[in-house]
Amino acid sequence: MKNISTPSAVPARGPADHEVRDQIVAAATEHFSRYGYEKTTVSDLAKAIGFSKAYIYKFFESKQAIGEMICINCLREIESEVRAAVAETDLPPEKLRRIFKVFTDASLRLFFRDRKLYDIAASAATENWQAVQAYEARVQQLLQEILQEGRQSGDFERKTPLDETAMAIYLVLRPYLNPLLLQYNRDTTDVAPAQLSSLVLRSLSP
């Protein structure tokens, strides 16, 4: 899992014209940021962009399909930032600390810098869109990779099953990944990453 991939099942129909699809997504992002995701219909979007509703349906089968693409772009931005931070160190314990810190900071910044776009993130989390499922699976895989490195280096214990350990850490991290949960934890984001990662690292000591 070295590359960040776009989930193949995100609905996209019609001509493989990436420029037009990108144009629709960019215009939709701007429109949603002004008027909100829930209040916007495909007809509203078509009128704002200057395309016909039927033309948009050649590329996306629903409003959710457009929302998923916007969601993918946002999650890719967060994930890229985290992976860059993790790649800067060879020490597994430090990688875990950065996982907690950067995921929290990047999610907070991206999800709440635009309250209208937050609607998309909230819908994605509430309805468990495939883009979110794929993102969560990649986060768990990244945790497993770091845990495996730590076990090989002797930094982490080896008795607990790897997948069980990764899931437990993911559940600790999840309130700072999921926008629905993060909105209720914003007052702890200054201290939580350091405190939680320290607690996790103590539990991983061999």
Q: Would you name each region that the model predicts?
A:
Residues V102-Q144:
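Short secondary-structure transition hinges
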Residues M1-Y35, T40-F51, A65-E68:
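Basic, helix-initiating cap at the start of DNA-binding domains
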Residues F32, T41-V42, K53, K63, ...:
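Amphipathic alpha-helical segments enriched in hydrophobic/aromatic and basic residues
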